[in-house]
Amino acid sequence: MEFPVARNPQVKWKTGMLNEAEEMKDADFPEIRLFHVEHQLAPDGEKEDCVGKWVVCNPENLKDFSAVGFVFGRKLYKELSTPVGLIQSTWGGTHAESWTSMKVMENNPLYADVLKQYSKEKVSREKDKCKVPATLWNGMIAPIVGSVSYTHLRAHETVLDL
């Protein structure tokens, strides 16, 4: 089973759990793995594959997992007795529209202004290219077919309407 999870890579790993030190020490689950998707822009269409690396859930690698991903993966593993693959596909400071498919945006009037505002020609600075609508969907999500997502979005009002 594979499930994408996200964490902010700029934030030091903290679970918010009262027993955080114990959780980290006991986090030895070789059948729970995390695939970290490398950053890949794709403004011109969906990619068929993505690049990344797998890490095993152990005390040393737990810092690579989000707290939600770790707890979720552990719960699935214990309840289902099956290996679990978690997928982390993140890019800090990006907009929800970058992670939304062009098909969804073109068929939803809520996105009309967004699509006008962010034409490829208007995004010239390299650091802003990750904010082009659908570019992160195309490069980092579309290659991962059939996934469940958990994320903390700033644009939750728009996303919830989908």
Kindly give the residue locations of the regions a language model identified:
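Cytosolic catalytic cores of cyclic-nucleotide second-messenger enzymes
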Residues: 162
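Metal/cofactor- and membrane transport-associated sequence elements
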Residues: 1-148
